[in-house]
Curated annotation (Swiss-Prot):
SMART domains: TOPRIM (SM00493). Keywords: DNA damage, DNA recombination, DNA repair, Metal-binding, Zinc, Zinc-finger. This is Recombination protein RecR. The lineage of its organism: Bacteria, Pseudomonadati, Pseudomonadota, Alphaproteobacteria, Rickettsiales. It holds the Pfam family RecR_HhH.
Amino acid sequence: MNKTNDHEIDQLIYLFSKLPGLGSRSARRIVLYLLQDKDVRLKSLINNLVEIDKKIVKCKICGNMDTESICSICSSKYRDKSVIAVVETVAELWAMERSGNFKGLYHVLGHNLSAASRQNPSILRLPELLKRCFAENIKEVIIATNSTLEGQTTAYFITEYLKEHPAKISRLASGIPIGGELDYLDEGTLSAAINLRQPFE
């Protein structure tokens, strides 16, 4: 990374460069943009980050991010509470919400499993999922993990873990390419995948 001869600015560039999808060049442009109108752009960002740090918490039911300990999705009376979509991270939850085509509940695993690294399945929130399935009388579990090798491995472990529950288990269908991640799909493709989901064997 090219240095600016200012430690504080270099540190800020470094922090931005670690964000997903950003490299050092993009990070430098962002920092320069903020500093060019520091009183408005930078202070607005700082104030917003402080508020987020104070107010945003993880939903104690599904793992979503919200200002309440039970998020607006879990507490909504308009959601179909007999269906749960299991996603890897909040990013996939947001992607499904953008599609506007899923009206059920969610369960955020927080991780995926890599067959190569031999991760322990205990890193997933599967006990909480099984408990919810029984307590909330869930009729269908939609496995909405990514179509990557890690996502497929994770889907297998979810299916094995839920064998003792009678809920129908399905998987997002057509339109998701092998290796594809939900967060990068357009709303139409993701809507089709939800509508055409199939039983997962």
